[in-house]
Amino acid sequence: AGANRDISKVIQSLPGVGGTVSFRNDLIVRGGGPSENRFYLEGIEIPNINHFSTQGASGGPVGILNVDFIKSADYYSSAFPSGRGNALSSVFDFKLIEGNKDKPSVRASVGASEISLSLNTPVTENSSLLFSVRRSYLQFLFSQIGLPFLPTFNDATTRYKVKLNKKNELSFLFIGAYDQFKLNFDAEQTE
């Protein structure tokens, strides 16, 4: 509750984890800096899990990861696994759900700041596809109320997994985000 479908807000409720001001998702673990955390998705390090991040921080106002696809999140505030070094404060290791093997599942949603479309479907008897795309609509709301900035964010997550045999599988993972600010020249100037 209160996380607005954002994994960083959920993480801030863990013991020893704090945050900064309410509009950002910076993670402060046991007094370390926000840039001292490491994030992994399916064993691959991702440099940031938030939109509109700033240099020297791990947070931004909105998360990149689609929570519909998160199966688990392992959290280490000390005694990091040997393959997860180079972190001073914490390590977060996210795992994705398994793709549907029987029938396609499509989900569309409207959140507090974005619209999204997710697809979880079998491709062949031995393969599956997870696909998600999101786009913000804040720029339209901010324009209507006359704010001087118009933020837009987009992100996509895709994983194609094929089972080669009983012991081997091959996965292709894509995660991407694009953020943009525009000035609202139609906004009234404040004094």
Give residue ranges: language-model regions.
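Outer-membrane beta-barrel proteins
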Residues: 15, 61, 80, 105-107, ...
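Transmembrane beta-barrel outer-membrane domains
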Residues: 22, 87, 101, 108-112, ...
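Transmembrane beta-barrel wall of Gram-negative outer-membrane proteins
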Residues: 107, 111-135, 147-180
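Outer-membrane beta-barrel translocator domains and adjoining extracellular loop/strand segments
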Residues: 142-147, 177, 182-189
